[in-house]
């Protein structure tokens, strides 16, 4: 009788892997969900495609063309995928040899870069950001040997600030002919002037990640994009699954990216920015809040006295925030998604009542 278990049959790196702790996986029984940087209210769409007996297009033409027009790039510079998370993984699969190459990222930042690399068996290297959360370019330069993909989130999740554009240029020069630089622009709709999409002609090794999950209010759709030069896109097409977007997803995405859909998105962004400033101003006056950091996104990072107790107290009241204590340099920090005015008021009232 064999004593080998199913777990024994698994790859060693998978057995040792800690899965990404998404907001939904962490759970909670709240009624004020401010932990996943989602848009706070639902948007409505009507399905127009009824051909569910047929496989969808591999790269739906209407979605690609609409997004290219919106982003100011050519259709051949756009790849659509199951969320930006799939784009993160595709870039590693296309450019990194497991057991040989490495990726590099700069914590505190988004957690899926490391999870995607570790799943595939690719080494992760980290260069923590400077005290102002900008790139440590010297540190990156020192660790670039063997690195094939560098991930930089801007605006950065969870800190909320933009990376200095001159630092991006320096990084792109450092990596020219050596590695792909990936600018994760999941939150760029909240600061569109900072996008690097206009740099693609200048830097053939630049790739940009985008999503419909944030400003487009479609987190449940799972639709993201990679913007890059055609040579990069063609390589990604070799490793992507044949039908990444279902017909209903492609249908809704095309509607969201129509001229009317873009107008509606920009109205949502203006509303969220106004609410963000209201919440920042209120947080700065609350005694348990030590520091509120500037944000270019739909969330706010703040440092609290007794942050773990504050987090649990609000959790028990049904207000679910995102604890960032385990991230480098974020001791005492909680991240708060900007929600509705009613949700902001629930947070403000609960924090004012904290005795710490």
From Swiss-Prot:
Keyword annotations from UniProtKB, A to Z: Amino-acid biosynthesis, Aminotransferase, Histidine biosynthesis, Pyridoxal phosphate, Transferase
Entry keyword annotation includes Transferase: yes
Pathway given in the UniProt record: Amino-acid biosynthesis; L-histidine biosynthesis; L-histidine from 5-phospho-alpha-D-ribose 1-diphosphate: step 7/9
NCBIfam families reported for this sequence: hisC
EC number(s) given by UniProt: 2.6.1.9
Alphabetical GO biological process terms: L-histidine biosynthetic process
Presence of the UniProt keyword Amino-acid biosynthesis in the record: yes
UniProt-listed InterPro entries: Aminotrans_II_pyridoxalP_BS (IPR001917), Aminotransferase_I/II_large (IPR004839), HisP_aminotrans (IPR005861), PyrdxlP-dep_Trfase (IPR015424), PyrdxlP-dep_Trfase_major (IPR015421), PyrdxlP-dep_Trfase_small (IPR015422)
Catalytic reaction equation(s): L-histidinol phosphate + 2-oxoglutarate = 3-(imidazol-4-yl)-2-oxopropyl phosphate + L-glutamate
PANTHER family per record: HISTIDINOL-PHOSPHATE AMINOTRANSFERASE, HISTIDINOL-PHOSPHATE AMINOTRANSFERASE-RELATED
CDD domains (alphabetical): AAT_like
Subunit structure: Homodimer.
Protein's organism: Escherichia coli O9:H4 (strain HS)
HAMAP family: HisC_aminotrans_2 (MF_01023)
Name this polypeptide is given: Histidinol-phosphate aminotransferase
A molecular function GO annotation: pyridoxal phosphate binding
The protein's required cofactors: pyridoxal 5'-phosphate
Protein family according to the UniProt entry: Belongs to the class-II pyridoxal-phosphate-dependent aminotransferase family. Histidinol-phosphate aminotransferase subfamily.
Post-translational modification N6-(pyridoxal phosphate)lysine, affected residues: 214
């Amino acid at each position: 009788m064999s004593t080998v278990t199913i777990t024994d049959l698994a790859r060693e790196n998978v057995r040792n892997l800690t899965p990404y702790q998404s907001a939904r996986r962490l759970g909670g029984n709240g009624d004020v969900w401010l932990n996943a940087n989602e848009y706070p209210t639902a948007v409505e769409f009507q399905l127009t495609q009824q051909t569910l007996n047929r496989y969808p297009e591999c790269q739906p033409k209407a979605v690609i063309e609409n997004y290219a027009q919106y982003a100011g790039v050519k259709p051949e510079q756009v790849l659509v995928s199951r969320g930006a998370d799939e784009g993160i993984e595709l870039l590693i699969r296309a450019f990194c040899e497991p057991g040989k190459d490495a990726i590099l990222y700069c914590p505190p930042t988004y957690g899926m870069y490391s999870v995607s690399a570790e799943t595939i068996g690719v080494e992760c290297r980290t260069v923590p950001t400077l005290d102002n959360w900008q790139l440590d370019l010297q540190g990156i330069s020192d660790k670039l040997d063997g690195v094939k993909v560098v991930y930089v989130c801007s605006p950065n999740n969870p800190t909320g600030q933009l990376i200095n554009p001159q630092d991006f240029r320096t990084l792109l020069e450092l990596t020219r002919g050596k590695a792909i630089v990936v600018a994760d622009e999941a939150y760029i709709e909240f600061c569109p002037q900072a996008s690097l999409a206009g740099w693609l002609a200048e830097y053939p090794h630049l790739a940009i990640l985008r999503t419909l999950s944030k400003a487009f209010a479609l987190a449940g759709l799972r639709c993201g994009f990679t913007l890059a030069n055609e040579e990069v896109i063609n390589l990604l097409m070799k490793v992507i699954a044949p039908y990444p977007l279902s017909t209903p997803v492609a249908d809704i995405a095309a509607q969201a990216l129509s001229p009317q859909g873009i107008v509606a998105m920009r109205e949502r962004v203006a509303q969220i920015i106004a609410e963000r400033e209201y919440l920042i101003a209120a947080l700065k006056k609350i005694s348990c809040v030590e520091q509120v950091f500037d944000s270019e996104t739909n969330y706010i990072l703040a440092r609290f006295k007794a942050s773990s107790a504050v987090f649990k107290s609000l959790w028990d009241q049904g207000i679910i925030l995102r604890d960032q204590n385990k991230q480098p340099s974020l001791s005492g920090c909680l991240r708060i998604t900007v929600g509705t005015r009613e949700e902001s008021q629930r947070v403000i009232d609960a924090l004012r009542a904290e005795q710490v």
